Amino acid sequence: GAAGQVFDERCGQCHRVAGVSDGNRAPDLSDLATRPTLGAGVIANDAEGLRRWLSDHQSIKHGIAMPRHDDIPEETLGQLADWLETLAP
């Protein structure tokens, strides 16, 4: 779907997801749904937190290397968040 394509194009170069991408420059997201927090503990890993993280991670954790996603529509970021919430081992 659209979320998987966005992940592949925009996230998979840095992030690994088992069976999807092999990025190794940023955290492995294969088990993201099982983690209590995002950004090394700076925000809760729940539906709202994940959407905030995808939309505004630069403000939440200053100096983070992950690029901004201003060019990705909010609806698509929401779909990406929904997909990421399913990732568990």
Language model features with spans:
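Extracytoplasmic electron-transfer domains, predominantly the class I c-type cytochrome c fold
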Residues: 13, 19-88
